[in-house]
Amino acid sequence: MRALLSAPGRRPLSPPRALIAALAVALAAPAAAVQMSDVAPMAGMSALAAAQDEAEGASPTAERAVKAAYLYKFLGYVDFPGGPLDPGAPYVVGVAGAEDVAGELARQTSGRMVNNHAVVVRRLHDGDGAAGLHLLFIGAAEGGAEAALVKAAQAAGALSVTESATGIEAGSVINFVLVDERVRFEVSLAAAERGRLKLSSRLLSVAYAVQKGGG
């Protein structure tokens, strides 16, 4: 990876550009079909986490890119309560309160597949429900609506992902945190169980923290 960031004869990339370049490599490996009993190597998530360590820190642009990349990768590491998707059906990702992440996610997933399924990004507005979603990302701008959106995602069997200090407390399955200026994520297994979601051990192995009870 370092050869990509600082190849001989090339000017070293700035941290944000270096991070985005590294993410492109991490995203190149498609996510494999996920079952809790899978033993096949699934390096995509680990590569994505390691990509940030090649950069000095996260600018707003880089932070947005990393979060979008994680959201894309999360889809391939979760068994949803409805079972495998029908052939030709897309994964649907809803985004509330984070227009910048929605735009970046749409860009990153354009033409890409997860388990042979396309990814559709849906921007949610006030009053929109979570029905039909597989993942709901709730931006920090939602504030007081966070808990209600998390509850709606749980009822719909969708993976909830937040980015606030109260995300796990509000019942979110995954919450983004900044650690030493790098985007990491924490997981609530209790919340996943309430939403009838099974998370791959590969995903859990690269989480910053895993809460096993409560939350």
Q: Which residues fall in each region the model found?
A:
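Short hydrophobic alpha-helices and adjacent helix-cap/hinge residues
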Residues: 2-215
